[in-house]
């Protein structure tokens, strides 16, 4: 009887350790998901800014071309 109680305690300890580890991994996953969402938002914003800069540069180059043609 003593042996099976010891085995049960070891099993209980391993299960608790696994549960604790899973809880930590879930918290880490939640943090990574949140960080990923922030990075996706930042990426989207930077892409929009990049497009806006490209449009402004094209407009400026167009004006320079018009000036060159009128000279």
Curated annotation (Swiss-Prot):
Keywords: Cell cycle, Cell division, Coiled coil, Cytoplasm, Septation. The keyword Manganese does not apply. GO terms for cellular component: cytoplasm. Gene3D superfamilies: 1.20.5.340. Belongs to the ZapB family. Non-essential, abundant cell division factor that is required for proper Z-ring formation. It is recruited early to the divisome by direct interaction with FtsZ, stimulating Z-ring assembly and thereby promoting cell division earlier in the cell cycle. Its recruitment to the Z-ring requires functional FtsA or ZipA. Homodimer. The ends of the coiled-coil dimer bind to each other, forming polymers. Interacts with FtsZ. This is Cell division protein ZapB. It comes from Aeromonas hydrophila subsp. hydrophila (strain ATCC 7966 / DSM 30187 / BCRC 13018 / CCUG 14551 / JCM 1027 / KCTC 2358 / NCIMB 9240 / NCTC 8049). The lineage of its organism: Bacteria, Pseudomonadati, Pseudomonadota, Gammaproteobacteria, Aeromonadales.
């Amino acid at each position: 009887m003593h042996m099976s109680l010891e085995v049960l305690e070891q099993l209980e300890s391993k299960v608790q350790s696994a549960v604790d580890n899973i809880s930590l991994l879930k918290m880490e996953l939640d943090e990574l998901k949140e960080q990923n969402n922030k990075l996706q938002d930042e990426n989207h914003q930077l892409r929009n800014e990049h497009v806006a800069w490209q449009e402004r540069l094209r407009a400026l180059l167009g004006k320079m071309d018009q000036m060159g043609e009128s000279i």
